[in-house]
Each structure stands twice: as C-alpha cells, then as structure tokens.
Amino acid sequence: MPALLRMTTTAQLAGHTQGGEPLRRDMTRIALAKPYWDAECEKAAVSALSSGRWVKGPQARAFGEEFANWCGAISAVPCQSGSAALWAAMRLLDIGPGDEVIVPGMTFIATATAVSLVGATPVFADIEDEYWCICPDDVESKITSKTKAVIGVHIFGQPFSPRLRTICDSHGISLIEDAAQAHGALLEGKMAGAIGDIACFSFFPSKNMAVGGEGGMVTTTRPELAERLKRLVDHGRDDTLESVELGTNLRMSEVNASVGRVQLKHINSWVSKRRENSDELNHSTKIRENSQHAWHQLCILSDEPTSVISYFDSKGIDARVHYPIPCNRHQVYSEHFQHEISLPNCDLIAHKLVAIPVHPSLSDEELQRIKDALHHSTF
C-alpha cells in the first residue's frame, strides 16, 4: 500500500509545534468545508417563498431536468436528502427481504442502512488499497443467487472502478452509484450520475454543491425507471393522484430546489477549483486512470491521525478522520454478525484517513497555510 503523504511521529510533530510560528490572532480559522451562499442564492430563495408555491412546483421540476442534462442521466428527481435518495433506489429496484446488496465497508453508514431499512441484507466488501473505493475482486467473490445490486461509492470524489459495471452486467445485477461526494467526477468520459443504473446524490451543506439545507437527487440511466422514480418520492401516486404503489413523501421544497438551480450553474467551475487546489497542495493521492476526481475531500494517510489533527488545529486548520469506523463494526451491524468479517484494508486504512480543506472558497493565503502545515507534518 502506498504511503500517501505519510505523517510523522508525535515527537516530530511536537518539535515542529515548538519551533514553528504561533497562529497569528488576525488569522481566521480554515474550515474543512464552506457552503456557498451569495445574493443570487438569496434572491432565488426569497422568490420561491414569495411565490406561495412552496412544494410540488416548477423549481423542483426544473432542478431535476437541469441536473439530468448536466450529468447525462435519463431522468433526475430531487428529494429530501442523500439518505432518502438511497432508500428510493432500493425501492426502485424492488429490493427487499431475502435480497442482498453488496456495499463497501468504508463509507458513510447511510449506504448500508438504506439496504437494511427495506429489509434486505447489506453484504460488506473490502476497499482497494490504492483508491479506497469498493474492491471489485471482493465484490465478485461475494455475489450469490440472492445478490440484487452493488452499491459503489465514489469515495471522497474518487470514481469507483469501471470493473463494477462489467461485473454487474455479467451477473445480471444492478449497479447503484453512491455519488454523495462525487458531483462532477468523471469515469471513462461519463459523469457520476450516469455510470450506474441509478445514482444517489447528497446536497448536505459540506458537499460540492448544496441547496441551503438538506437535499438529495436520484438519477437513472434506465428509461423504464424514470416515471416510477417520480412516483416513489410522492407517496407512489400517478398523474391521477392515485397511489399505485407504496411510496412516501421524499419531495424537495421549492426553496431548496431554487437554491440548487443557482448552485448547479457554478458546479463545474467549483469542481475545477477543487482540482486546482488539490494540485497546488502537491499531495500524492493516486487518481484512477481515465477518471477525474471531484475532490469532495482531500484525504491523507497518517499513522498518527490524532497528532496530525492536533497539529493542524494549532495552525487554525480544520482536519478530521473520514470514516474512522468501518460500517460492519458499527454497533448496529456488529451485534448481528455471527462471525468475524474480514475486511483487512478497511481495518487498516479507515481510521488513518485525515481530511484537510480543499474547497473552492480557499484564498491563496489559506492554501499556503495548508501547504505549510503539510510540509511540516509529512516526510
């Protein structure tokens, strides 16, 4: 496994702290993430509120259409959160009791709980040692007659392996993208959102784009799923308002959709700026061939993450571990396993990945401060 920006020991960090310059009082703290908000966002939100049509209006419809056109999907439907999007994906594929869905062991817990909430079983697969996405070899070894789908996570904005598409096609199972962190990522010329059968996005404030609150988006590349997707987020109702299948209220508000439409206009330039910032920080994170990283997070491997985070904190820079506990080791799942699940890369890597700021709002001075902190805390 490559030592990506391998960090120093506690003693070395202590030496740098003692010998380095203290944080100046005029220096503002550098946030790990910073949601975008400007006069255009505010104007859109106020306009949506003033319209008196706060739900099921033109803003949400337009946002879905524009998002689908942007990412290359057949259809896109806004919803209340990334977690809601994952639940909708399960229902859209009729996944339920007796079914299995293969998910990565290292991801946000919602990837796995979406499977459990429909009564299906999440089967945890290990991650790659270089790119940290779900490992195709481990996925293929865990496919059974019960496997209904694979959820590939574009972790931190890194596109998952194109082999997942081949594996799913050869076994006749669906591929779901968890693209919560991958707005603007590209894999072999396709944008996240148009790689799998279904994709799920999050607009949580820390993501590459947001909606002024909670929000999500479900996209599909399969025309036969498009109309059903619209029904599932609105109580399973068709155009006659009859509920023809089991659904629930996952609709996005007009206010959130109006903000999302504004932010969608800027997302390409924001992702480009994230890539520029990532390059400027001169890290050695490996990027998959024939892909473009979206840099939701710039994560570095550290043998002593607590010490590194403390050092960055002393310099007024936010940093934290993503994600310290593999999903299978969370209490909600570990209590239900009758045997130890072997996910060696998850166990080795998950608690060592330190995320540092890379967002597009960073000034030149802030980028330099982050570079200096990296220089003083890496080999």
Segments (PLM) and residue ranges:
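PLP-dependent aminotransferase class I/II
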Residues: 12, 20-21, 61-65, 73-76, ...
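N-terminal "arm"/small-domain region of PLP-dependent enzymes with the aminotransferase-like
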Residues: 7-53, 58, 315, 357
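Helix C-cap/helix->beta junction micro-motif
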Residues: 118, 170-171, 315
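Short beta-strand->loop structural element characteristic of the AMP-binding/adenylate-forming
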Residues: 121-131, 320
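Hydrophobic residues in well-ordered beta-strands that form the structural core
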Residues: 97, 103, 124, 175-177, ...
